[in-house]
Amino acid sequence: EDGYSDNSLITASCSVHISLKTYEKIAVTLGLDCNHEKILLNQEKINSKKFDRDGISRKRFSMDNYYPFLCGIGDDELISKTLSNFYNEGLGIKCVIEEPWVTFAESSEFIISLVKMNRKEDAKKILEEVMRFQDNRGIFPTGYQYKLDILWPDEFSTWTNAAVIIAADCVFGISQKRNVFLA
């Protein structure tokens, strides 16, 4: 009606949520007044139809299912359901529920979600599976299409490799620093 679509992205909203929570921690450290409780996400907001793009459910995309866990939103039953829907044993996390490919950025972000939701053993298992795809240079491909047994897409994206590093740090505490996703 006003020229704007009434759509919101769960992934973007969760990223903003994490940023606001981090800002609040910084503000407290600096002695500044800050309260974003009214605009922060919760399970009720996540279940809103505003996240169904143009009336089409986004539940088939793994990111739209696990990003709320990065914010600490959800419960063990919901994360188990997400794991059941998107986890491919021995390979990692599918990007899209009906497609035969896993991506290692999605796998890594889901690993972080599992650690955040106190499912560290599941996180460790999936990370070990992802590690099998590291090439002889120490680099991870973006994804793997398991029906065709090919790397797909045929690229080695920086964000994928960054996500694997962050996931490994969440699981093993390699940096020995506090992780913003786990705070």
Model-derived features with residue positions:
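Generic hydrophobic alpha-helical segments
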Residues: 23-24, 75, 117, 171
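Alpha-helical positions within canonical tetratricopeptide repeat
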Residues: 34-35, 121-125
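Internal helical hairpin/lid segments
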Residues: 97-118
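The feature captures the catalytic groove of carbohydrate-active enzymes
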Residues: 1-39, 115, 153, 179
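Alpha-solenoid helical repeat scaffolds
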Residues: 26-29, 120, 133, 174
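Residue at a conserved register position within TPR or TPR-like alpha-solenoid repeats
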Residues: 20, 27, 69-72, 111-114, ...
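Extended glycan-interaction surfaces of carbohydrate-active proteins
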Residues: 1-8, 38-104, 125-183
